[in-house]
Amino acid sequence: MSDVEENNFEGRESRSQSKSPTGTPARVKSESRSGSRSPSRVSKHSESHSRSRSKSRSRSRRHSHRRYTRSRSHSHSHRRRSRSRSYTPEYRRRRSRSHSPMSNRRRHTGSRANPDPNTCLGVFGLSLYTTERDLREVFSRYGPLSGVNVVYDQRTGRSRGFAFVYFERIDDSKEAMERANGMELDGRRIRVDYSITKRAHTPTPGIYMGRPTHSGGGGGGGGGGGGGGGGRRRDSYYDRGYDRGYDRYEDYDYRYRRRSPSPYYSRYRSRSRSRSYSPRRY
C-alpha cells in the first residue's frame, strides 16, 4: 500500500507542476494586456492634449494678427485723416482767392475807412461840369501838382463824378485834404481823401453794356455816345463810380440767369411737363 500512495502523491505533484506553468502565462498575458492598454491610452490623451494646445495657439495667433492688422489699419486711416485735415486750411485759402475785378474792389473796403497818407488824393462828389482845369486851380494853392485826372466814361464821354489829384510832396497832400475836404465846387460839396487805388477802375465802363431791354434814349452815330436805355442819372461818387459797377454786375447776372437756365432746372422742367401732360391709363 505504501508504494501505491507514493505513486499517487508523485502523480499529483506532476499534475500540479504541469498546471502551474500553464497558469502563470495567463497571468502574464493579462498583465501584458493591461500594460499595453494603459500606455496607448496615455499616448492618445497626450496627442489630443497637444492638438488642443496647438489649435488654441493657432487661434490666439490668428486673433492677435487680426487685432494687429485692425489697429494698424486704424492708425493708417487716422494718419490719412489727419493729413487730409492739415491740408484743408490751405485749400480754403486757395479757393477764397478769386481773380475777378469785383473781388479786387472788395479787398480795399477794409482800409477805406483809414487809408495810408500818400501823394494821391481822391476827390469825390464832383459835378458833371467840373473839369481838370478847375481842379488844378483849386488844389495848386496847397503845393505843386504832378497831375490831375478826371475819370470819364469811355462810351458816353461824361464825367463819372470823381477825380485824382497827384501832389509832389506828402505834406502838401495832407494840407489839401484837411482844407479842401467839404468845400463847395460848382454847386456840389466835395469830399477829399487819400486814394487807395491811385487810379480809376478801367474794367468798369459805368453803364449797362448788354442789349437794351426797354426803350430809352437813342444811340449816337459813329462817334459813340447817346443814352443807354432809360438809365437813372446820379452824380454822387458812390452812385456813379463804384456802385454803378455793382449794378452792372447784378444786371448781367440777372440777364444770364433769365436767358440760360441751368441744365438741372431744364431737365426737371421737361420731366414735370411730360408727366403732367401724359394721358392716364385705366
Curated annotation (Swiss-Prot):
Composition bias, Gly residues: 215-230
GO CC, one annotated term: nucleus
Region spans: Disordered: 1-118, 201-245, 260-282
Main location: nucleus
Keyword Nucleus assigned: yes
Modified residues (Omega-N-methylarginine): R232
Keyword entries, A-Z: Acetylation, Isopeptide bond, Methylation, mRNA processing, mRNA splicing, Nucleus, Phosphoprotein, RNA-binding, Ubl conjugation
Purpose: Sequence-specific RNA-binding protein which participates in the control of pre-mRNA splicing.
This protein's name: Transformer-2 protein homolog alpha
Organism name: Homo sapiens (Human)
